[in-house]
Amino acid sequence: MTEADRIARAYEGLEERAGGRWDPANRGNQAIVRERRVATTRLLQEAGMLPLGTREVLEVGSGAGGELGWLLELGAEPERLTGVDLLEDRVATAAKAYPGIRFRQGNAEKLEFANGSFDLVMSITVFSSIFDARMAANVAAEILRVLRAGGGLLWYDVRYDSLSNRNVRAVTAARVRELFPPLRGELTTVTLLPPLARRLGPLTAGSYPLLARVAPLRSHLIGLLRKPLH
């Protein structure tokens, strides 16, 4: 079994097995998404990339398409957005939900795009699912290849191992630098530990921001890493 096969098998039917862990109606999950999107907007604004307009954007591991769909709120043109995912059913779900956006099934080790095709590449909780070092290096190399000089990689992934999901492993800041040595930019901690956030219930609005101020309780890294012009 290849690493890509292992990942696909691990994520087939994951939502059903997770027992509502990622329920979008959960207030903690809503707070997690809201915080990430606020941080993403700030990073793109500071980089001078908003409104997205005609910028070409690729999401590796696009899942059900929600993050690319959200970029429409940041001024992206749907025909400029592309998502790639291993699972055909996720690609089908995304294409149905966002018919104006291009979604493709494929392995990110071999992206079918020309060099420098994208101004922005998004990797949201992707590399934490790749255990094989060679595959991780291959995917990183492909991201670097299709990213234009001056473009950015939007990174968001876990910095701690998951106690509830054995198919996820931590990706430290040092590991990100190893995977993408040419890229420049800062990674900061974000996201209250999801198991804690999901248990806050009606206290979420007040408690989430307070608890998220405690650095060890922030489980993810986020950053916009730029590819030098030269």
Regions found by a protein language model. Name each.
Residues 122:
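A conserved beta-strand element that flanks and buttresses the S-adenosyl-L-methionine
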Residues 58, 65-110:
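Class I SAM-dependent methyltransferase SAM/SAH-binding core
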Residues 1-52:
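Conserved class I S-adenosyl-L-methionine
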